Every structure is written in structure tokens, then in C-alpha cells.
Amino acid sequence: MKMNSKQPRKQRKFLYNAPLHVRQKMMSAPLSKELREKYKVRNLPVRVGDKVRIMRGDFKGYEGKVVEVDLKRYRIYVEGVTLRKVNGTEVFYPIHPSNVMIIELNLDDEKRKKIIERRAG
């Protein structure tokens, strides 16, 4: 499904109705300078197990592993970034992937290694 429209309403519609394989690509975050030099890639989709640094918002400066990627809500959940509810339980704070920087990649998946090699050129 190719997106050619500049109309904000159609851009929003595409975002809301995007299939999961397209949403995964939209969940990209920039890599740190060290990783960028090492892998020759500027950004990658965030995955569970990646270590990220939060760059914007109330939790700016926090670092932790990604524990969940929520494709439905376009949010990620980071270890150690929690809020306490009134009843005392801890809940993860949802963060948009554009507000984080990947500082360590989870390379357990062979397919991901191949994706990085392919994108590096």
C-alpha cells in the first residue's frame, strides 16, 4: 500500500489502519553514534531486548532494556521506567520510539543481522 497523499487526514488514516508488518517499520529509533559508525545504519526498528536511552519527556536520561513493543499503540515499554498506581502496583510507562535512542542492539536473531548487513550496503 503506497502512500502518496500529503493530506493530514489521509496520513492519519494510513497510520491508524496500517497492517502489523508496516507498523513494525514505523517503530524505528535512531542508533547511537557508536552503533551508527559500527553498523553504517542510521536507525532500526526497536525490538525486545534492545537497550535504549530515553531522549525526551519526563524520563529523559533513563536507560534500560525494552521489555515490550506495542504495535497497536505505537509504544514501547522500558525496564525501570514505571509509574506507581494508587493501589501500589507498578506499571510500565508507554514511550514513543521516536523519543529513544538505541544504545545496544539485540542480535540474537540471524534475520536481523542480515537486515543490518543489507541496509549498510
UniProtKB/Swiss-Prot annotation:
Keywords: Ribonucleoprotein, Ribosomal protein, RNA-binding, rRNA-binding. One of its GO terms (biological process) is translation. GO terms for cellular component: large ribosomal subunit. One of its GO terms (molecular function) is rRNA binding. The keyword Nuclease does not apply. InterPro entries: KOW, Rib_uL2_dom2, Ribosomal_uL24_CS, Ribosomal_uL24_euk/arc, Ribosomal_uL24_KOW, Translation_prot_SH3-like_sf. It comes from the Archaea. Gene3D superfamilies: 2.30.30.30. PROSITE patterns: RIBOSOMAL_L24 (PS01108). NCBIfam families: rplX_A_E (TIGR01080). Part of the 50S ribosomal subunit. Belongs to the universal ribosomal protein uL24 family. One of two assembly initiator proteins, it binds directly to the 5'-end of the 23S rRNA, where it nucleates assembly of the 50S subunit. This is Large ribosomal subunit protein uL24. It comes from Pyrococcus horikoshii (strain ATCC 700860 / DSM 12428 / JCM 9974 / NBRC 100139 / OT-3).
